[in-house]
Amino acid sequence: MAELVSKRYASALFELAFEEQKHHKVQEELAFIRSCIEDEPSFFELLKSPLITADEKKDIISNIFRDRVCMEVLNFLYIIIDKGREAYIKDIVNEYILLVDSVQNKVDAVAITAVPMEKQDLLMLQANLSKSSGKNIQLQNQVDPTIIGGVLVKIGDKVIDGTIKNRLATMQEQLSKILV
């Protein structure tokens, strides 16, 4: 249910923002709101609290974000509060960002390596992945020494495993079949 609610609210806001050519600005402002919620868990708990009235929550939101976000985002937050959907704010923001990214053909990806990648190597891998996938890949590097060497790339739900660890496991499996 949470996913359905989040998608509905995100889609409604996206349609409004896209019509007014504000979808990028709204995305930035929603990301800011999400970071505020993540940085201050007590703030999120306050928003979800049934002990605080909707009007009090809207006053709090207004005092914090009035000068930092556009009226569309502020009104959207008011609607979320009026409908009792405060617990879904982070999920709604995540869904909204996915909608904007899909319009831009943008996909987040992770390159996992045993040691940090050089910036130029990361950019070259990003360019190659973008070219082969036809999408605007946004590549981040994560370090995991257990993969020994090579690179493991995760693009959405796809995995490209070019690690030494995987090659050794494959060789071990093939050798065990031969020896049995």
UniProtKB/Swiss-Prot annotation:
Membrane topology: Peripheral membrane protein
Subcellular location: Cell membrane
GO molecular function list: proton-transporting ATP synthase activity, rotational mechanism
Keyword Membrane: yes
A single Gene Ontology CC term: proton-transporting ATP synthase complex
InterPro entries: ATP_synth_OSCP/delta_N_sf, ATPase_OSCP/d_CS, ATPase_OSCP/dsu
Chief place of localization: membrane
Keywords: ATP synthesis, Cell membrane, CF(1), Hydrogen ion transport, Ion transport, Membrane, Transport
Pfam families the record matches: OSCP
Subunit structure: F-type ATPases have 2 components, F(1) - the catalytic core - and F(0) - the membrane proton channel. F(1) has five subunits: alpha(3), beta(3), gamma(1), delta(1), epsilon(1). F(0) has three main subunits: a(1), b(2) and c(10-14). The alpha and beta chains form an alternating ring which encloses part of the gamma chain. F(1) is attached to F(0) by a central stalk formed by the gamma and epsilon chains, while a peripheral stalk is formed by the delta and b chains.
Similarity comment: Belongs to the ATPase delta chain family.
Summary of the function given for this chain in its UniProt record: F(1)F(0) ATP synthase produces ATP from ADP in the presence of a proton or sodium gradient. F-type ATPases consist of two structural domains, F(1) containing the extramembraneous catalytic core and F(0) containing the membrane proton channel, linked together by a central stalk and a peripheral stalk. During catalysis, ATP synthesis in the catalytic domain of F(1) is coupled via a rotary mechanism of the central stalk subunits to proton translocation. This protein is part of the stalk that links CF(0) to CF(1). It either transmits conformational changes from CF(0) to CF(1) or is implicated in proton conduction.
Protein name: ATP synthase subunit delta
Species name: Alkaliphilus oremlandii (strain OhILAs)
Name of the coding gene: atpH
